[in-house]
């Protein structure tokens, strides 16, 4: 446990943030605010002002001095934050331009763009121009990178003037804004900073690409670009734009995309020149480049033959492991012909990624494939493609329907789908009756998100009338005024408003915004089906059977098939699935008739069917299906002069609760129908495994037929049902749900775009919390493929601009890295190596621990806005909660006081979804944290609770160490992180979901969950248990009765003496969720007792529950330790005498009882 690592990190981080400050401001002055120990508390005061350089030298002198490492750490921890005074407020944009010029000059002294790079860029530019000319018919005006003045001149209808010249509106131009949590010039300055500190490590190819990308950035920067400022105003007025002859439409996006390519230049392995090609092509065809540059991967994954190993798996979704024997390679002539045919027609022949693919078909090394795969991931980083909602939705729902279809196949499809739904719905109605006494109001409304209800209306909120689109407020309004809200069909027939979703490399998609009634009716049906699918109720057919518990190796069966190459793997992609003919009348009538038939099957009568707010769920479901079969979509483009569009639509509505699970059912029915018909003509086909996930599907089968015959026949069968499909077949590789499985290895693409976002960041979040989620995404990209260098570069880009908080116009506070990497409104809530939660302190000194606790906790501030309390006493809120409480009492057949209190608390929190309330909460929190910072002298009380790493250090101080045996193993689930690989080699890989040591059973929680219609968390139980006197029998009994437990269950539970055991488990429930190891690559680790015992061997006489908690705490600290230091060890703790043992046990139990666990934004359930 070397504190040297921690010291080096802390010093480097402080220095980095300081040197960035001196780079982007002219002559700033800085002063340390230092903490002084004052027995009970710490006292903060400000020291004298210096230049950043002087301060950097001061920190450097501490690190180099002869005092002990612990004393050095103490000196740096005492820096609470650094005040930065900026007198010269000259425009930062000018400073950035000077930096750009200096950087380009510096690179030009070392290299120039070679002919090879020049040819690559020119070739792809010409190809992009040709493609643009050939496809110009399908282009909208905003797909061209043209002058903004020209665009406005010929498309006046796309802009709306505002009262303020800088507050004009335009959906289309706003879609071209990259949406990043800093201004564009700040991004450029942080990229320049991060490259300048690595300047001497670049090779010649990297320098050439840097030269090209920085030149592109400079050209666009000098010409000017349009951006939305933090105060939601535009940077230019329309009058300026009409005159301006240099600002191009895509300038800002090209700058952000170039910055993204500079970051991926640090990925290993990658083709550097291809990154330059991406930008060259993107500059010509900004809306289409990502899609067309990435498309060859779909075919390549099916034909590339990797050097790998055979994988064996059982039929259980999550069991698979690689063996020693090499995988089997198999490629048919027809596949090669298809690939060559496609590639000869591919419009971007000069793409270096495609050239690498063509050279690497047979016997490809994993490294080579990784390089190609990283190039593929890089194409998505040009950012989100955003079209005008009207154009996009119109294109999305255009489908030719025909009566010339195979009637017999349609009947088969319809009966299959109906039969599946009938069985499920019959089971559903009975379960709701036996479980909730048929009243599902509480469950449905508790799960309702406070999203848009589609249209705006006036409602009373506290003392004012507000116009709002929020579902919750509409619901409260309906209930409190006793309005008739049951005629759902009529409501839908008036028209369905549309929202949109944007993703990189795909066209904008429409989302149906259905009213709250639809969500309330469909919730329990969807939940029932999902739960069943998750339990594997439909075999391993549904992707939902593959939950986080085993998300790592769910694809085991497919990994096995691709490594043995003995089955044909077929993946079909139905274009425009939602609007396809089989999803119109057949899909809706299958639902309607399934409900009618289910009613003849179950043993309950009509009055016992589930109801929500007095509406019969099944009746209303029929009404919704009938209304949606023939609906009108209303598509508005409010930031333009376009008229609202009404489009007739008959397909599936993405926006229903049942959309995804319903699609999965329809998909199973569709594939089954196709294969039933196929076996008539191809009797040798034997389907082995089928998997659907919404509209995605994969089938593996044994067949004696040729691969091209099977493909042609499949296409023909789909055609007879009027479904346009791409049927891709292969023996060795496939793509499913954004994962790529090839020759027994599973790759995930690192395609999370960091410098652009789908929507603008809310003004209510602090820059630190948005930066935290960006670091998290960058870590996921790094783990998946880009590697550790990329993550280091990204932290250097993301952290320095977000490390300071503005206090006044001229004063900023540069926070200590310790505060930044902890939890709270001004923190990232993530560690520098990408795990969710707080950065750990790896130091053994008690004094340092005290200082560290102060720095991490003094800004963890939570504020409850007054509006929440006020709204909870209004008649509107009561109307909703009273209905929900009576529903809980009907369902639980008891008063269930605690459950109803928890319900009230949870409903109160939903008021945060009301516009401005969340904003107020976050702003108050940030304001309070700022005030805490701006007091030059203040007293901070010491933290009395223990941090988990204190237990870790305690055990290590009493242990002996050995070097662990790391098993070299063949990866099935690929990652590109040295430290994760080390952890996998020591702890093993999660291979099965069967033999884990399960979390200890919390009987109390199980009993409550069995009866309660709303979700109850373990922390709720702990909170409410404090309100009862649990020392005597009556107190215990009352506590259990108020939880809704009665009769025999109450008697048995009281006799079992389990109450305190269960409350202890509830208190530490967070330990059983992996604390923010949300990256799937980390889920490949079996974080359980067995793994903990591979690292720690502890012989202390602890009660069993405490032993488990101790081991889990130690294991999580160990994961943090390895991810930070890269060192592994094995620790043995055997106390020498009984006295020492007793002392240690007492200390450990006290620490566990008073532990302070993180509350984290990012978390994943592990069990």
UniProtKB/Swiss-Prot annotation:
Keyword RNA-binding belongs to the record: yes
Classification via Gene3D superfamilies: 1.10.357.80, 3.30.70.2480
Superkingdom per UniProt: Viruses
Disulphide bonds in the chain: none
GO molecular function: nucleotide binding; RNA binding; RNA-directed RNA polymerase activity
Domain RdRp catalytic: 553-735
This enzyme's EC code(s): 2.7.7.48
Catalytic EC class: transferase
Compartment(s): Virion
Reactions catalysed: RNA(n) + a ribonucleoside 5'-triphosphate = RNA(n+1) + diphosphate
A GO-annotated cellular component: virion component
Broad class of the protein's primary localization: virion
GO biological process: DNA-templated transcription; viral genome replication
UniProt keyword list: Nucleotide-binding, Nucleotidyltransferase, RNA-binding, RNA-directed RNA polymerase, Transferase, Viral RNA replication, Virion
Pfam families noted in UniProt: RdRP_4
UniProt-listed InterPro entries: DNA/RNA_pol_sf, RNA-dir_pol_luteovirus, RNA-dir_pol_reovirus
Function noted in UniProt: RNA-directed RNA polymerase that is involved in both transcription and genome replication. Together with VP3 capping enzyme, forms an enzyme complex positioned near the channels situated at each of the five-fold vertices of the core. Following infection, the outermost layer of the virus is lost, leaving a double-layered particle (DLP) made up of the core and VP6 shell. VP1 then catalyzes the transcription of fully conservative plus-strand genomic RNAs that are extruded through the DLP's channels into the cytoplasm where they function as mRNAs for translation of viral proteins.
UniProt family annotation: Belongs to the reoviridae RNA-directed RNA polymerase family.
Subunit organization: Interacts with VP3 (Potential). Interacts with VP2 (Potential). Interacts with NSP5; this interaction is probably necessary for the formation of functional virus factories.
Listed name of the protein: RNA-directed RNA polymerase
Native species: Rotavirus X (strain RVX/Human/China/NADRV-J19/1997/GXP[X]) (RV ADRV-N)
Lineage, opening ranks: Viruses, Riboviria, Orthornavirae, Duplornaviricota, Resentoviricetes
């Amino acid at each position: 446990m070397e504190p040297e690592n921690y010291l080096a990190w802390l010093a480097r981080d402080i220095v980095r943030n300081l040197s960035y400050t001196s780079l982007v401001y002219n002559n700033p002055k800085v002063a340390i605010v230092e903490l002084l120990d004052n027995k009970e508390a710490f006292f903060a005061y400000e020291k004298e002002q210096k230049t950043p350089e002087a301060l950097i030298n001061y920190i450097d002198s501490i690190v180099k001095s002869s005092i002990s490492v612990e004393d050095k750490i103490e000196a740096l921890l005492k820096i609470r934050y650094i005040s930065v005074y900026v007198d010269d407020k000259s425009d930062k944009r000018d400073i950035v331009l000077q930096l750009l010029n200096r950087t380009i000059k510096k690179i030009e002294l070392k290299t120039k763009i070679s002919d090879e790079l020049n040819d690559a860029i020119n070739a792809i530019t010409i190809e992009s121009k040709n493609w643009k000319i050939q496809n110009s018919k399908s282009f909208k005006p905003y797909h061209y990178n043209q002058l903004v003045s020209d665009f406005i001149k010929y498309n006046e209808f796309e802009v709306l003037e505002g009262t303020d010249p800088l507050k004009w509106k335009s959906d289309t131009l706003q879609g071209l804004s990259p949406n990043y949590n800093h201004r564009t010039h700040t991004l450029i300055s942080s990229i320049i900073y991060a490259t300048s500190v690595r300047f001497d490590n670049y090779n010649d190819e990297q320098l050439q690409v840097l030269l090209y990308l920085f030149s592109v950035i400079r050209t666009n920067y000098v010409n000017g670009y349009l951006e939305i400022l933090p105060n939601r105003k535009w940077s230019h007025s329309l009058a300026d734009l009409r005159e301006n002859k240099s600002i191009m439409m895509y300038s800002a996006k090209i700058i952000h995309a170039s910055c993204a390519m500079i970051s991926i230049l640090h990925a290993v392995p990658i083709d550097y020149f291809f990154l330059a090609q991406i930008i060259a092509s993107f500059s010509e065809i900004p809306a289409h480049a990502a899609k067309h540059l990435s498309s060859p991967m779909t075919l390549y994954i099916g034909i590339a033959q990797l050097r790998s190993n055979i994988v064996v798996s059982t039929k259980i979704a999550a069991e698979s492991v690689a063996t020693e024997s090499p995988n089997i390679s198999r490629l048919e002539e027809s596949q090669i012909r298809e690939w060559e045919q496609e590639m000869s027609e591919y419009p971007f022949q000069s793409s270096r990624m495609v050239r690498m693919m063509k050279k690497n078909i047979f016997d490809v090394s994993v490294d080579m494939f990784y390089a190609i795969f990283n190039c593929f991931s890089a194409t998505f980083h040009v950012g989100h493609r955003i079209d005008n909602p009207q154009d996009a939705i119109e294109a999305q729902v255009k489908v030719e329907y025909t009566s010339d279809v195979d009637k017999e196949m349609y009947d088969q499809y319809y009966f299959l789908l109906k039969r599946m739904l009938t069985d499920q719905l019959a089971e559903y109605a009975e379960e709701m009756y036996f479980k909730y006494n048929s009243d599902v109001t509480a469950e449905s409304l508790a799960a309702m998100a406070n999203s848009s209800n589609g249209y705006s209306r006036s409602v009373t909120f506290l003392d004012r009338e507000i116009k709002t689109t929020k579902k919750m407020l509409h619901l409260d309004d309906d209930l409190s005024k006793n309005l008739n809200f049951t005629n759902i069909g009529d409501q839908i027939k008036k028209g369905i408003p549309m929202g949109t979703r944007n993703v990189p490399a795909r066209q904008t998609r429409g989302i149906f915004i259905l009213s709250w009634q639809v969500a309330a009716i469909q919730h329990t049906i969807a939940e029932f089906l999902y739960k069943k699918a998750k339990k594997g109720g439909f075999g391993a057919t549904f992707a939902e059977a593959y939950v986080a518990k085993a998300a790592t190796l769910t694809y085991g069966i497919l990994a096995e098939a691709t490594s043995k190459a003995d089955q044909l793997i077929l993946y079909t992609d139905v274009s425009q699935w939602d609007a396809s003919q089989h999803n119109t009348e057949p899909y809706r009538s299958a639902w309607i008739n399934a409900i009618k038939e289910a009613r003849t099957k179950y043993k309950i009568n009509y009055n016992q069917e589930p109801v929500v707010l007095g509406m019969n769920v099944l009746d209303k479901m029929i009404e919704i299906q009938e209304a949606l079969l023939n609906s009108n979509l209303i598509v508005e483009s409010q930031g333009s002069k376009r008229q609202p569009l009404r489009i007739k639509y008959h397909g599936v509505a993405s926006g229903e609760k049942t959309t995804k699970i319903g699609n999965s059912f329809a998909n199973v029915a569709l594939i089954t129908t196709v294969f039933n018909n196929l076996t008539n003509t191809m009797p040798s086909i034997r389907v082995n495994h089928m998997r659907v996930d919404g509209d995605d599907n994969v089938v593996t089968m044994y067949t004696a037929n040729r691969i091209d015959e099977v493909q042609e026949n499949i296409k023909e069968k789909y055609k007879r049902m009027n479904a346009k499909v791409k049927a891709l077949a292969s023996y060795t590789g496939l793509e499913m749900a954004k994962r790529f499985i090839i020759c027994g290895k599973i790759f995930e693409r690192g395609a999370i775009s960091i410098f652009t976002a789908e929507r603008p960041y809310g003004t209510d979040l602090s820059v630190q919390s948005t930066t935290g989620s960006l670091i998290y995404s960058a870590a996921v990209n790094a783990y998946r493929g880009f590697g550790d260098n990329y993550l280091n570069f990204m932290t250097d880009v993301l952290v320095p601009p977000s490390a300071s908080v503005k206090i006044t116009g001229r004063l900023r506070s540069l926070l200590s890295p310790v505060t930044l990497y902890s939890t709270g409104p001004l923190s990232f809530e993530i560690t520098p190596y990408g795990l969710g939660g707080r950065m750990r302190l790896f130091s053994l000194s008690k004094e340092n621990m005290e200082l560290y606790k102060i720095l991490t906790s003094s800004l963890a501030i939570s504020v409850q806005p007054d509006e929440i309390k006020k709204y909870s006493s209004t008649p509107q809120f009561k109307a909703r909660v009273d209905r929900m409480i009576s529903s809980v009492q009907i369902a639980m057949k008891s008063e269930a006081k605690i459950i109803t209190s928890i319900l009230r608390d949870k409903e109160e929190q939903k008021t945060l979804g009301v516009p401005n309330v969340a904003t107020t909460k976050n702003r108050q929190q940030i304001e309070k944290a700022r005030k805490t910072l701006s007091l030059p002298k203040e007293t901070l009380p010491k933290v009395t609770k223990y941090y988990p790493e204190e237990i870790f250090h305690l055990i290590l101080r009493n242990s002996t160490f050995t070097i662990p045996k790391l098993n070299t193993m063949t990866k099935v689930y690929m990652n590109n992180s040295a430290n994760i690989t080390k952890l996998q080699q020591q702890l093993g890989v999660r291979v099965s979901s069967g033999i884990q040591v399960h979390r200890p059973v919390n009987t109390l929680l199980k009993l409550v969950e069995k009866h309660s219609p709303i979700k109850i968390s373990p922390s709720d139980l702990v909170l409410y248990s404090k309100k009862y006197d649990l020392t005597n029998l009556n107190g215990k009994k009352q506590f259990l009765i108020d939880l809704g437990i009665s009769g025999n269950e109450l008697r048995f539970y009281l006799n079992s003496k389990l109450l305190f055991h269960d409350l202890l488990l509830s208190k530490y429930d967070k330990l059983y969720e992996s604390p923010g190891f949300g990256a799937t690559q980390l889920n490949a680790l079996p974080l359980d007792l067995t793994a903990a015992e591979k690292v720690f061997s502890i012989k202390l006489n602890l009660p069993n529950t405490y032993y488990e908690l101790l081991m889990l705490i130690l294991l999580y600290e160990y994961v943090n330790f390895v991810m930070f230091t890269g060192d592994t060890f094995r620790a043995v703790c055997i106390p020498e005498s009984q006295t020492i043992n007793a002392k240690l046990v007492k200390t450990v139990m006290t620490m566990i009882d008073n532990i302070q666990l993180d509350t984290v934004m990012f978390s994943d359930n592990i069990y």
